[in-house]
Structure formats: structure tokens, C-alpha cells
């Protein structure tokens, strides 16, 4: 009951902000102050946010004065403009879009064994590995663990991959599966994945600050991340491009990508439908603990879905690299999106507050519990 009362208070506060904004044509300081209050309360140092609903577009980069100098905040010198963040698993959705474009052109068969395209040397169980397909990877039904070892470690590229579940038996989130599919795409295209991404996504959409690899501009634009205790953990450079987690971007760039997803840019209607259609099984995040929120969540081709009583199908993904956390929500029925990036371990604590403010949903999204509750 207490949580519902808190949610109701936030929802009505969002309505007040909305009414004030409409009547004042619009006063963006109302949103800015509300977002600033949210990140101060949740101990998030920095947030970038982009949204576009019903023609009302929001674009913010807001610093927390408890982490950055107030004088520099006022002068605009506290953080680089635009700040570049680790996108974490939002990396996967950009890659999924690339795969779906290749599928649309007949360059990859979603149901063909990936061993037709690349080797399976790292897999302990070769028979199971030979059954893996792109569709299984994108639906997170490979049976693989998230990672065999830390993917930024020196040992990871040659580490042995052991199956966690039987192939195609259940939902099981796996970065290792995406890395396997990355190798297949690189073999098909004869190029490194960042070069493929530049051709397919970054250049066509004007995402000039986005890359799977470290770029010289990141020396000044990339921001430091902060752990749960508010300690600076640095920028966190990764040793190699990995579609599971190494994308760096800014919210404005990623918003261009989200608009392209909504519009189906570069995809036939059929491919867009396949992209956004869930596999039919619920995405039960913890096999030993079936939660109520799991009943609303499934996985399409590299993108999460929520069946929402207010908005219908909602498309989403979260990013979690520890000291960098991010989120996007696409609502096709409203032709709108919200995305935000934070440099904080607390970056997902604000999901309900931010969605109530920006989307003005009457009830919390199941997404919040799916991400935050064990």
C-alpha cells in the first residue's frame, strides 16, 4: 500500500508538471528541476535524458551539485558537452538492428546454425554449439551463461564456454551468445564490428559520438562512473569491441537510433515485425524465482517487450555496467520514446520516478521490478 501511495503522489506530481508546462508554453525549467531533484535524492551524479512524446521533446544533461562544483555547473563547465557514457547492454540493441538489416537483405539466415558462418572452438559442448542460431541468440535462448569470464579480461577471448541450460530450453540472458553472433557477422561482412556499425547505423543516422571502440574524442568527452558508495571508478576503457557491452554514446545520439527503430528506417515492414515480435515464452529472469513482473515481460529479436495495460506493447532495454546504467522505453502506440544514461550504480533506482514524470504512466511499468527486484 505504501508503494502505491508513493506512486500515486509521483503520478499526480507529473500531471501538475504537465499542466504547468502546457500553460506556460512550455517552461522546461519545471522538468529540469524535477529531474535534478530525482538524481539528488538517488545519489546519481549525472544524467542525460531524451524523450519525444506527442510532439513534446525533452533534452537534458543535468549534474548533481553534490558531485560537481556548483559554480562550474552554472557556467556549463562541470561536465563535457555532450558527455559520453558507457551504454552497457544498450549496445546489444544496436547490434540486433544490424543483424535484422542483414536478415532483410538475405545476408544471414536467422535459423541457420551459426557454425555455418564461424568456428565453435571455444565451446566445450560442440554438439550443442552446432545447434545455435541467430534467432536463439537474439531471443536469449542459447542456454549460454552471461559470460564465461569477465569479457574485459585478457583471458576471455580464449576461455572455454560451458552451457548453463539445454539449447533453446528457456530464457537465459547471455552476452556470450551475442559475442558469438558478432563473430559470425564479422566473418560474413569481412570487417570488424565497429566498421560494420558505422556503415549500417552510426553514419546514416548521424550518431557522431557513438562507437563500440574507444575513440580519441572520448579522452575529453567520456565521463567517469561512480559506484554505490559514490566513489569515482573512472571511465572504464575496454580492451576490444564487444556488442554485448562496449558501446559508448550520448543520449542525443541514441535517441536518433530509437526514432529509427520506431520508424522502421532501413527495414522492410516484414523485418520490422519480426524484429519486434516476442518469441512466445516469458522472460523469467531468475529460473528459481518466477516473479509477478515476469508475466508481462518477453524477448523479441534482441529487445525486451512488456505487455502493458495502458500502452499495449512496450519495447525496452536496460544497460548495466555497474557504475554506468541506462534505459530506453519505446511505445509504438504513442509513437514515442524515452532514454536516459547515468554514470552511477544507482541509475536504475530512478526508473519509476523518471517514467512518471516524462511518460506519465498511471501505473509503474513491470520493467522496473524486472530490473530491480530479485
Predicted regions and their residues:
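Short, conserved catalytic-motif segment at the N-terminal edge
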Residues: 32-85, 107, 154-161
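Stable alpha-helical elements in mature extracytoplasmic
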Residues: 31-35, 91, 110-114, 130-134, ...
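Short active-site loop at a secondary-structure junction
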Residues: 45, 71-136, 163-176, 242-245, ...
